Swiss-Prot record:
Full protein name: SsrA-binding protein
Function: Required for rescue of stalled ribosomes mediated by trans-translation. Binds to transfer-messenger RNA (tmRNA), required for stable association of tmRNA with ribosomes. tmRNA and SmpB together mimic tRNA shape, replacing the anticodon stem-loop with SmpB. tmRNA is encoded by the ssrA gene; the 2 termini fold to resemble tRNA(Ala) and it encodes a 'tag peptide', a short internal open reading frame. During trans-translation Ala-aminoacylated tmRNA acts like a tRNA, entering the A-site of stalled ribosomes, displacing the stalled mRNA.
Gene Ontology biological process terms in this record: trans-translation
Pfam family, one: SmpB
Top-level taxon: Bacteria
Species the sequence originates in: Bifidobacterium adolescentis (strain ATCC 15703 / DSM 20083 / NCTC 11814 / E194a)
Taxon lineage: Bacteria, Bacillati, Actinomycetota, Actinomycetes, Bifidobacteriales
InterPro entries with a match to the protein in the record: SmpB, SsrA-bd_prot, SsrA-bd_prot_CS
């Protein structure tokens, strides 16, 4: 079987970009079992309500991510919401651990995707947005959409 090329996302955490201001992004590997990979190849995963923790031994874990059981699996299937270990360099984990000690910073998963046949997760160091920040960013997005719509309409009228 040929390796899949490209980085088409399997799952995205859409709410993360709304609730958090992204400061820095990282790419991490993910330790999975065989049935989890097969389930991901079917495109079945959810990062909603998921978060990342760093334990005392300096290991990062993805918690709350839902990878449903593989449909054709046997009794040897995986638990859908188990903790999954993230693979990063020790220096990167130390840096993230120091930065999360600062007030208001957290580490969140943004997306899951295949890269060269391996599952990767895009994680971000982020700061939580206040309610007025969320409203302001929504207003800015709406203004951009309206401006694009007006430009498209003006271009149609010129022709």
């Amino acid at each position: 079987m040929a390796k899949e090329q490209g980085t088409k996302p399997i799952a995205q955490n859409k709410k993360a970009r709304h609730d958090y201001a992204i400061e820095d992004k990282y790419e991490a590997g993910l330790v999975l079992t065989g049935t989890e990979v097969k389930s991901l190849r079917e495109g079945r995963a959810s990062l909603a309500e998921s978060f990342i923790t760093i334990d005392r031994r300096g290991e990062m874990w993805l918690e709350g991510a839902n990878i449903p059981e593989y449909l054709n699996g046997t009794w040897n299937n995986h638990a859908p919401k188990r903790k999954r270990k993230l693979l990063l360099h020790a220096a990167q984990i130390d840096k993230l651990a120091r930065q999360t000690q600062a007030k208001g910073f957290t580490i969140i998963p943004l997306s899951l995707y295949f890269k060269d046949g391996r599952v990767k997760v895009e994680i971000a160091l982020a700061r939580g947005k206040k309610e007025f920040d969320k409203r302001q960013s929504l207003r800015e997005e709406q203004d951009k959409r309206e401006a694009l719509r007006a430009m498209r309409y003006a271009n149609k009228q010129v022709r």
